[in-house]
């Protein structure tokens, strides 16, 4: 697959027959596989980010409600009740 620096591990010869652009089928397949792995990782990160965002929104709303309840118990008027 790839080395620690992202190298494909197979050097491409400039004068290879049938490879005018310098890349063969194996190199394209390796790059495609790496891109698929990166895409999967990014999808996973996006899902985790969405989940964390939803949980933080819930926590924020819960904290607002708790603060309002404490203010009402103390007989104070809420100074920042708007979201």
From Swiss-Prot:
One of its GO terms (molecular function) is molecular adaptor activity. The keyword Acetylation does not apply. Keywords: Cell junction, Coiled coil, Cytoplasm, Cytoskeleton, Phosphoprotein. Residues 25-74 form a coiled coil. Residues 1-25 are annotated as: Disordered. It comes from the Eukaryota. The keyword DNA repair does not apply. Pfam families: UPF0184. It is found in: Cell junction; Cytoplasm, Cytoskeleton. InterPro entries: BBLN_eukaryota (IPR005374). GO terms for biological process: apoptotic signaling pathway; bone development; bone resorption; gene expression; intermediate filament bundle assembly; multinuclear osteoclast differentiation. One of its GO terms (cellular component) is kinetochore microtubule. The modification Phosphoserine is found at residue 82. Essential for intermediate filament organization in intestinal cells, interacts with intermediate filament and regulates intestinal lumen morphology. PANTHER family: BUBLIN COILED-COIL PROTEIN, UPF0184 PROTEIN C9ORF16. Belongs to the UPF0184 (EST00098) family. This is Bublin coiled-coil protein. It comes from Bos taurus.
């Amino acid at each position: 697959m790839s080395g620690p620096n992202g190298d494909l591990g197979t050097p491409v010869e400039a004068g290879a027959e049938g490879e005018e652009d310098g890349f063969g089928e194996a190199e394209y397949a390796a790059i495609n596989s790496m891109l698929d792995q990166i895409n999967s990782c990014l999808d996973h990160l996006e899902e985790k980010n969405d989940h964390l965002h939803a949980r933080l929104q819930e926590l924020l709303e819960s904290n607002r409600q708790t603060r309002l309840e404490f203010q009402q118990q103390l007989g104070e008027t809420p100074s920042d009740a708007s979201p």
